[in-house]
């Protein structure tokens, strides 16, 4: 599948409680890997917090979306600006530079996020899978969030500041509510 096509494909829901997103990211595995695990680089597209370094590590994800975009934050996510929001995850798998998995706290217990990286020419294929999601409402939220954050990662890897982040989140949320 060509980069332009795969990067337009929406998040899929192979079964209830499971989301999957595939993207071709610009740059080699090693470069993409550091944007997943190093806190300062991850903060540019997703969340800062703790640099991830191995299995069984408890890591803090510090969400502060004002680090990602200059757009005004929608009201219901304002907490992400005012000091941010912190979430603790446990690293389940750590296989540099190809595989990272960690727990994800949600309202009905822990879900699990896996990032799989593989080389595609000089670029990197990302397969992001989020499992054990407790509700359709959370699936909608995670699908729109993951797609928007990975779109921001692509912009960062291209040397750009992410644009259109919140507009993307809101549009995708409407789309996934209708789909899921």
Where are these regions (language model features)?
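Hydrophobic ligand-binding cavity/cleft-lining segments
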Residues: 1-55
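A conserved amphipathic terminal alpha-helix motif
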Residues: 4, 131-180
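Charge-dense, helix-prone N-terminal extensions
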Residues: 4-8, 86, 121
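Beta-strand/loop substructures that line and gate deep hydrophobic ligand-binding cavities in soluble
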Residues: 14, 18, 101-147, 153-155
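Hydrophobic/aromatic beta-strand elements that line small-molecule binding cavities or substrate pockets
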Residues: 23, 49, 86-93, 112-119
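A short, structured loop/turn motif at beta-sheet edges
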Residues: 29-30, 52-55, 92-97, 117-125
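Tryptophan-centric aromatic hotspots in well-structured domains and transmembrane helices
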Residues: 33-36, 45-46, 89, 104, ...
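Short beta-edge strand/loop motif at the mouth of beta-sheet-based domains
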Residues: 40-84, 165-171
């Amino acid at each position: 599948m060509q980069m332009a096509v795969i990067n337009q494909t929406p998040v899929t829901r192979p079964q209830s409680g499971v989301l999957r997103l595939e993207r071709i990211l610009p740059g080699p595995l090693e470069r993409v890997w550091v944007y997943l695990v190093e806190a300062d680089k991850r903060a540019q597209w997703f969340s800062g917090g703790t640099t991830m370094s191995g299995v069984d590590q408890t890591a803090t994800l510090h969400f502060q979306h004002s680090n990602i975009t200059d757009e005004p934050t929608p009201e219901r996510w304002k907490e992400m600006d005012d000091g941010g929001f912190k979430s603790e995850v446990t690293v389940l798998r750590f296989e540099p530079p190809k595989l990272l998995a960690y727990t994800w706290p949600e309202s009905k217990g822990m879900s699990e996020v896996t990032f799989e990286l593989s080389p595609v020419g000089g670029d990197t294929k990302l397969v992001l899978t989020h499992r054990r999601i407790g509700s359709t409402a959370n699936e909608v939220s995670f699908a729109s969030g993951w797609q928007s954050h990975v779109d921001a990662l692509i912009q960062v890897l291209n040397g750009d500041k992410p644009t259109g982040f919140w507009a993307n989140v809101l549009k995708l949320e409407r789309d996934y509510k209708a789909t899921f």
